[in-house]
Amino acid sequence: MTKRDLVIKIAKTTRLKQSDVMQVVQQTLDIITEELAQGNGIEFRNFGVFEIMVRKPRIGRNPNEPEQTVEIPERVVVKFKPGKVMRERVLELNPGAVVVDDGE
């Protein structure tokens, strides 16, 4: 689902104009992004939590030349932990019916 798909679905169920819904959705995403960029976590009850984590520096390997090591510096990443309701709903899925996009 894309942002546009989300806007259309919300507009249909709420009978609001798509342009108004798009503005609210975009503003919501902008605020979430800004809070995370300031190092703040975000919690949506029953949905999940966005957290800022620091990955420690480590040594990696070049897959094309396994004998060559590469230093990977520490970095800040966003981690999402699904809430109880989302976890339970996803667990109800039939694994055979899930279409996975492998990026190809």
Describe the residue ranges of each PLM region.
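Strongly charged
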Residues: 1-104
